Amino acid sequence: MSGHSKWATIKRKKDAIDSKRGAIFTRVGKEITVAAKMGGGDPEGNPRLRLAILKAKSVNMPKDNIERAIKKGTGELEGVVYEECLYECFGPAGIAIMVSAVTDKKSRTTPEIKSILTKLGGSLATSGSVSRLFEKKGVIVLESSQIGEDKLVDLAVGEGAEDVINEGEVYRVITTPDDYESVLHALNEKGLKSEESEIRYIALVSSEIADKEVAKKVMKLIEQLDGHDDVTSVTSNFELAASLEKEFE
């Protein structure tokens, strides 16, 4: 099991809790607002907004919430002004971490992210030193109880997906950024609901962690980064050694 798979499990559990208190809607709403601000409120002419709306629908965000978020971005409704932040970070044992955030005050968010890193053996990195270790991919996570693996592979790959990974309770569909929208739309059209869907950074090379205490610190760091109110996604290149997998099930 890779670090990404393990983190996917943690993230799914966290998202299940978040959804009960509306945190996911808040995060997705920010993404919609930023997209509308940058490219206008018409999804047909704004691919980024179209993708953000697809993501909102995949987590069952109410239509009224989506429309309000768009209007905040276009200025039709008053609201705070958001901006995107991308933090390149190093964690314990030199693991690489990419943190994406949307904030209304970068001067607040950056020190808070830095503080989380410092307390748990991490640090902010210089621009380009970490991002070169990752590439952007479309990632769609589905509960495996919804569809058989062979049927999903036929459907997803037929629409341009690069890979379908069976992780037991869930499938992880990987696409290029360009094919992400068509694959997600095809899955939605078949009535398949995604637990998570976004274009995010994926590590090109993994970094194995074999020390239990270091692994605990890494997991805690990523949980705290992802728990920050302004953070929209966290991706790392760590991979748990086989000897530690049962410790973190």
UniProtKB/Swiss-Prot annotation:
Protein keywords: Cytoplasm, DNA-binding, Transcription, Transcription regulation
PANTHER family: TRANSCRIPTIONAL REGULATORY PROTEIN YEBC-RELATED (PTHR12532:SF6), TRANSLATIONAL ACTIVATOR OF CYTOCHROME C OXIDASE 1 (PTHR12532)
Organism: Leptospira borgpetersenii serovar Hardjo-bovis (strain JB197)
InterPro entries (UniProt xref): Integrase-like_N, TACO1_YebC-like_2nd/3rd_dom, TACO1_YebC_N, Transcrip_reg_TACO1-like, Transcrip_reg_TACO1-like_dom3, YebC-like
Record GO biological process: regulation of DNA-templated transcription
Predominant location: cytoplasm
Pfam families associated with the record: TACO1_YebC_N, Transcrip_reg
A molecular-function term among this protein's GO annotations: DNA binding
GO cellular component term of the entry, any: cytosol
Similarity remark: Belongs to the TACO1 family.
Lineage of producing organism: Bacteria, Pseudomonadati, Spirochaetota, Spirochaetia, Leptospirales
NCBIfam families referenced in this protein's UniProt entry, alphabetically: PRK00110.1, PRK12378.1, YebC/PmpR family DNA-binding transcriptional regulator
Gene3D superfamilies: 1.10.10.200, 3.30.70.980
Subcellular localization(s) per the UniProt record: Cytoplasm
Transcription keyword on record: yes
Name recorded for this polypeptide: Probable transcriptional regulatory protein LBJ_0543
